[in-house]
Amino acid sequence: GLLSKVLGVGKKVLCGVSGLC
C-alpha cells in the first residue's frame, strides 16, 4: 500500500544519504 511505498522510498533515501549501500 501507500505506507509500504513511503517506507521503501525512505529506505532508499537513508541508504543514499548515509552511504551504507
Swiss-Prot record:
- Its chief place of residence is secreted
One GO cellular component assignment for this chain's record is: extracellular region
Q: InterPro entries under this entry?
A: Nigrocin
* Gene Ontology process terms (BP): defense response to fungus; defense response to Gram-negative bacterium; defense response to Gram-positive bacterium; killing of cells of another organism
Q: Where in the cell is it found?
A: Secreted
Keywords carried by this UniProt record: Amphibian defense peptide, Antibiotic, Antimicrobial, Cytolysis, Disulfide bond, Fungicide, Secreted
Query: What Pfam family does this protein match (any one)?
Result: Antimicrobial22
* Record's keyword annotation contains Disulfide bond: yes
- Taxonomically, the superkingdom here is Eukaryota
Which tissues is this protein detected in according to the database? Expressed by the skin dorsal glands.
Q: Which pairs of Cys residues are joined through disulfide bonds in the record?
A: 15-21
Q: What does this protein do?
A: Thanks to its single linear amphipathic alpha-helix, may integrate into membrane phospholipids, leading to lysis of the membrane. Shows antibacterial activity against both Gram-positive and Gram-negative bacteria and against the fungus C.albicans. Has no hemolytic activity.
Q: What is the name of this protein?
A: Nigrocin-2
